[in-house]
C-alpha cells in the first residue's frame, strides 16, 4: 500500500468514524460507509488539508469511492 493510499484511508476513517477494515479501495463513501452529503463535504476538506491541494467542487462531486480519492490525490501532487 502506498503512502498516499494509507493517508487517504486514515482521513476516511477519521472523518467518517468507520472501522479501518471497512475502508477498502472499492468502498463507496455513501453506499458502503454511510456518509451523507455533509460528511462528503467534510471529507473533501480534510483531504485538501492533508495533501495541501484544492479540490474544485465539480471534481469533488466525482470522488465517490476510496479509490477515486486516491487516484485524484496521486494525479494532483
Curated annotation (Swiss-Prot):
InterPro entries: ACP, ACP-like_sf, PKS_PP-bd, PP-bd_ACP, Ppantetheine_attach_site. Pathway: Lipid metabolism; fatty acid biosynthesis. 4'-phosphopantetheine is transferred from CoA to a specific serine of apo-ACP by AcpS. This modification is essential for activity because fatty acids are bound in thioester linkage to the sulfhydryl of the prosthetic group. Transmembrane segments: none annotated. Residues 2-77 form the Carrier domain. It is found in: Cytoplasm. The keyword ATP-binding does not apply. GO terms for biological process: lipid A biosynthetic process. The modification O-(pantetheine 4'-phosphoryl)serine is found at residue 37. It holds the Pfam family PP-binding. PROSITE patterns: CARRIER (PS50075), PHOSPHOPANTETHEINE (PS00012). GO terms for molecular function: acyl binding; acyl carrier activity; phosphopantetheine binding. It comes from the Bacteria. GO terms for cellular component: cytosol; membrane. The keyword Nucleotide-binding does not apply. Keywords: Cytoplasm, Fatty acid biosynthesis, Fatty acid metabolism, Lipid biosynthesis, Lipid metabolism, Phosphopantetheine, Phosphoprotein. Carrier of the growing fatty acid chain in fatty acid biosynthesis. NCBIfam families: acyl_carrier (TIGR00517), PRK00982.1-2 (NF002148), PRK00982.1-3 (NF002149), PRK00982.1-4 (NF002150), PRK00982.1-5 (NF002151). Belongs to the acyl carrier protein (ACP) family. This is Acyl carrier protein. It comes from Leucothrix mucor. The gene is acpP.
Amino acid at each position: 500500500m502506498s503512502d498516499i493510499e494509507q493517508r487517504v484511508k486514515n482521513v476516511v476513517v477519521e472523518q467518517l468514524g468507520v472501522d479501518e477494515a471497512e475502508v477498502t479501495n472499492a468502498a463507496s463513501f455513501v453506499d458502503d460507509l454511510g456518509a451523507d452529503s455533509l460528511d462528503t463535504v467534510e471529507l473533501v476538506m480534510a483531504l485538501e488539508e492533508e495533501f495541501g491541494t484544492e479540490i474544485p467542487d465539480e471534481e469533488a462531486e466525482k470522488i465517490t469511492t476510496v479509490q477515486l480519492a486516491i487516484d485524484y490525490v496521486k494525479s494532483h501532487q
